[in-house]
From Swiss-Prot:
This is FAST kinase domain-containing protein 2, mitochondrial. The keyword Transit peptide applies. The gene is Fastkd2. Keywords: Mitochondrion, Mitochondrion nucleoid, Phosphoprotein, Ribosome biogenesis, RNA-binding, rRNA-binding, Transit peptide. One of its GO terms (cellular component) is mitochondrion. The modification Phosphoserine is found at S113, S126.
Amino acid sequence: MNSKARSLLWTIRRFSTLLPRSRALRIDPLGTCRPEVIHSKWNPRNHRLNVFDEGLQPSVRYLFQDIFISKSVDGCIQTKGISHSAVFKPDRLLCPRRLSFDAKHSFVSDGTSDHDLKKINFHHTSSEDVFTKKVRPTPVNYKKLAQECNSLSDVLDTFSKAPTFPGSNYFLAMWIIAKRISEDKRRFERQLMFSHPAFNQLCEQMMREAKIMHYDHLLFSLNAIVKLGIPQNTLMVQTLLRTIQERINECDERCLSILSTALVSMEPCMNVNALRAGLRILVDQQVWNIKHVFTLQTVMKCIGKDAPSALKKKLEMKALKELGRFSILNSQHMFEVLAAMDLRSVVLLNECSKVVIDNVHGCPFKVLISILQSCRDLRYQNEDLFKSIAEYVATTFDIWKLKQVIFFLLLFETLGFRPPGLMDKLMEKVVQEPGSLNVKNIVSILHVYSSLNHVHKIHNREFLEALASALTGCLHHISSESLLNAVHSFCMMNYFPLAPINQLIKENIINELLTSGDTEKNIHKLHVLNTCLKLDESTYKSVHIPLPQLPLSASQPNEKLAEVLSRLLEGEGRFSRNVPLPHNYHIDFEIRMDTNRTQVFSFSDVDASSATNMQRVAVLCVPKSVYCLNSCHPRGLMAMKIRHLNVMGFHVILIHNWELKKLKMEDAVTFVRKKIYSDEVLPTADTTV
């Protein structure tokens, strides 16, 4: 056997292995090449909503497979080993055959003629040929159908009366109708759709047409089917995924956008994962050819967090290249896109932030929330962006619902940003309308204000009393955990409402908190409650809640600060490090000085230790996280610790570890000397770090 014959046989065998359901182009009567599907294994009696079986499990080999070609015939490429089949070069298949199907019949090739189709009756066991002919009815317009029908069942009724090709139009019409009705009605309509007698027939037709319809129609169908809530593990959905995977080389820029939109809303499974892998390969090849920013962002959102770093970098460079063409919507949407990719591109975020700041007025609630959530997920802190959003919400305060304002503040709290103007506005509203608050609102407001340590200059007492009164009215139906969260926040703000605390310290409530839910977090908050009741001015100093001991937290004082103190105080005998204190507190360093803070005493000096004019000084080396964003305003836990250390007789000095880290040793000694030997008052208002 010569080499050419061996090569031909090898090609035929490889082709049959790679393509168990072969795709070819047959010569149309008009002389054009159109694709036709040759099914090797297809059972039309299978129920189309059965769970996807093993026979259709995905395989990576279906991604980007090539068709083996041997010679050219009249503008097409003739393949050997496939009878009467002509195919184009495999970069894209054109002009799919338009056929008409009804719910009872299907068309397949009989394998003997290029132009004839055999009609098989699915509801009869006989395989006898009935007739052979070509039908070209006018396809239904899905937009017109969506206007004429008022429900999903109406669309299925229309289909059952006169089914036409393509079936995708019926699913598109149903999705358009579903989008314009309420969620409750949509849920009811979906149940009626599943039980409609024509639904299974439409699924059968959709599966039969998948191989021959236009690729973009196929993708639109998948998107509509997924959005309609048809289970992803059904045979129809998995068949569409498999077919899309096999035909992925037909994907152009428009198809990339549609496919990405569909995949974003789908749960991971074997076929989805294989299709997403194929999409990544395709995007990697075509990224520089993408012309529309919207398509680029849709693809980036679909790529996912686990995409290769090289692909993420390539998409980032493409986005930076297109930055000048970004619209306002593109800039707003870019935050969500980068969060979906887990790509913290500071350059892109900074440029898009400028656009958002300039156009924040009139920006919808969902867009602003999405931007803040993305900043949280990406750990991106832009004070100017946060200020512009907070000021916009504060100036338009009356147009927002209470729960929307609270949602903004919860996100600002997670970002460590304190917006005083907006928080003062909400405090005034709470004082004026305490009856409008429910339990969830009360707990959320208390959490934000205690965490950010915000105090109103005028209405602070009235604000706390209004919240306490509203909480007291909810005690009969509040959960133990919500009550603990509320009282914990009150204690952090040095306020002790009688009724809520009396309810919380009941034995059955304490036992419930110690045995259910997040017990570790509950125990920590109860310890804070015990500490506040003992140290702060309250009527509950004699109350003690028996609790398990908290685990000792390993704390290593800053070594550079230890060396600075050793040089400054001329030896380690004049300070003590990592000092444990009552109530689960500890301090990094303790220094003993006179009340004027001009002289340092040695720890070995017994007379100095008992002197009445001695002042204990607590030196704490703190990170930026204990302050609100870009300020020296301490957050709630640090403010409470400072308050309690003062009660225990300490003067507190805070050393910023990020400032100390930048200084040389000589400069660091000078920096700490000014902190220790001065009467500097700890900041309680905003100052720039």
